[in-house]
From Swiss-Prot:
Component of the SWR1 complex which mediates the ATP-dependent exchange of histone H2A for the H2A variant HZT1 leading to transcriptional regulation of selected genes by chromatin remodeling. Involved in chromosome stability. PANTHER family: CRANIOFACIAL DEVELOPMENT PROTEIN 1 (PTHR48407:SF1). Residues 1-153 are annotated as: Disordered. Residues 49-60 have a biased composition (Polar residues). The keyword Hydrolase does not apply. It is found in: Nucleus. InterPro entries: BCNT-C, Swc5/CFDP1/2. Residues 23-34 have a biased composition (Low complexity). This is SWR1-complex protein 5. It holds the Pfam family BCNT.
Amino acid sequence: MTEKLIDFGLEQEEEDTEFVPGDSTDTESSFSDADSSEEEFVEEKEASQVQSTKSKIATSESEDVTLKNIAKKNKRERNDKLIPQQSNESEAIEKPVQSTTEVELKTNELAESNSSVAVEGDENSYAETPKKKHSLIRKRRKSPLDSSSAQKVLKKNKLNTLEQAQQNWSKYIKEQDIQDELRIANKDGYVERQEFLAKTRAAHEEKIREMKKLP
């Protein structure tokens, strides 16, 4: 067994010695060749993309040009169409032109008439309104006494509630003609008693004055 293990170890050493790495320059050249091939591939791809975009732009421009030419041709054909004079289309074309000219004439006439009326009105206003002369006489100022006297007159004309009630009551008595009935009913009333006492006092005072005047 020991001899077999020794033989197996020797075989592994021989295999290890047989593998010899190559030079480093060979590996570096292989890497540089791979990088250059990748760069060439990228450049070719970019060039193809640029050419495709240019072709697309050229096709779009050609389409625009063709569309514009078609549109111009259609316009020319429409403008160059001949129409007979007695057809409905010619009448429809001529009518709006006439109507617009008539409207413009009417508007011009109205504007001229309005301007003439305004000028005449201004002339009449200048003629009717004479210039105001400045008067040398000054107006008197209102005195405070006049205002106070006017206020007093207004206060006198105003009636109290009692005075207004008496006037209304007297008017009602005259309208209904109840004077006799009221006198009979109010013989023994408070108001008549007060009036009787006032009359007696006035008569007594007059007698006293006459007695004083005597020698």
